Amino acid sequence: MDQARAAPENIAKPIVWSIAGNDSGGGAGLSADARAAAAFGLHLCPVVAAVTAQNSVGVTRVEPVSPDLRYAQLAALGADMPPTAIKTGLLGSADNIAVVARWVDRLRARAPLALVVDPVLGASTGAAFADDAVLRAYRELLLPRATLVTPNAREARRLVDVCASED
């Protein structure tokens, strides 16, 4: 591991940044990513992209964090805890997708980096989180940089611009 990728000495596990939504119901987003990372022995650094108001039956509100706040979170981690991988979830806005894309490029200039894009475009209950600008940002900025993309069938159709009535 080169100096640009070296984690703080007190962290012996591989570092993964999860840039996703905070699910107040605890079933998805950063909560689920934290459980998955722990199961695989990874050190997860959660970066809050959006805050949701939701429970087990639905989502009542989604509030993306500002691009400045997202950038501040990434800059703090980038200065001290560089990742070997980034996993995205609910990003909430085209501006925030652009911030993530810039950080991926910046980190890859220093060392290899895997990017797993889970393009959360809506809730499992059907509520949509993504407008045309978000879809365009995914297509132009994140998907070309992705190592792996993990959409569900509905998200895949929206990302490739197939008629959503085929659900």
Locations of regions flagged by a protein language model:
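Conserved phosphate-binding/catalytic loop of the ribokinase/pfkB sugar-kinase fold
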Residues: 61-72, 106, 123-143
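Generic enzyme active-site microenvironment
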Residues: 85, 116-117, 150
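A short helix->loop->beta-strand "cap" motif at the edges of active sites that frequently abuts
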Residues: 107-115
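Conserved phosphate/ATP/ADP-binding segment of small-molecule kinases
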Residues: 128-167
